[in-house]
Amino acid sequence: MAQINPLPVPLGPWKITVYDQENFQGKRMEFTSSCANIMECGFDNIRSLKVECGGWIGYEHTSFCGQQFVLERGEYPRWDAWSGSNAYHIERLMSFRPICSANHKESKLVIFEKENFIGRQWEMCDDYPSLQAMGWVNNEVGSMKVQCGSWVCYQYPGYRGYQYILESDHHGGEYKHWREWGSHAQTFQIQSIRRIQQ
């Protein structure tokens, strides 16, 4: 049976259908809330999926750990559809949850040059495929405050590399250090950022 985690309850309709084979074949299950361990549902892994409503975060490991993948409305026939722009191809997707605070139209994020919200800062309300091309001098970000909505930050320009999902309703929207970006955070290198679509 699908496990409900202690995260905030979504305020709207969320729906994801997962399959144990590629191209939407084999065993399938629909979810409208979090799943901390797909193996408890009789799957050894998720091989394809369809996001019908809402934004979701998929995780490489159970219990919402490991590499993160943003899953927006659409079809993902194979693992490379959700990790294809990722420089680190990972075929595992073992847990997932809805993104409760995704609000594409009213998103606001402030990035800071150094940890603990120190140094140069820049307020963002739009998508940036290259922070450097838009005027951010560094290829690193020290800390971030999500004032509204949810964002996905990428290690490299063009929305490539590790994905870090930041939400206004987690950590109070405050990410003081790069290690708070996710259990898999390897570096504070961030070179592209975009809003998460609902």
From Swiss-Prot:
Keyword Transmembrane: no
Classification via InterPro entries: Beta/Gamma-Crystallin (IPR050252), Beta/gamma_crystallin (IPR001064), G_crystallin-like (IPR011024)
Residue segments, region N-terminal arm: 1-13
Keyword Repeat included in the entry's annotation: yes
Region described as Connecting peptide: 101-106
Superkingdom to which the source organism belongs: Eukaryota
Ranges of residues in domain Beta/gamma crystallin 'Greek key': 14-53, 54-100, 107-148, 149-197
GO BP terms: lens development in camera-type eye; visual perception
Pfam families: Crystall
SUPFAM superfamilies for the chain: gamma-Crystallin-like (SSF49695)
Domain comment in the entry: Has a two-domain beta-structure, folded into four very similar Greek key motifs.
Function: Crystallins are the dominant structural components of the vertebrate eye lens.
Quaternary structure note: Homo/heterodimer, or complexes of higher-order. The structure of beta-crystallin oligomers seems to be stabilized through interactions between the N-terminal arms.
The name this protein goes by in its record: Beta-crystallin A1
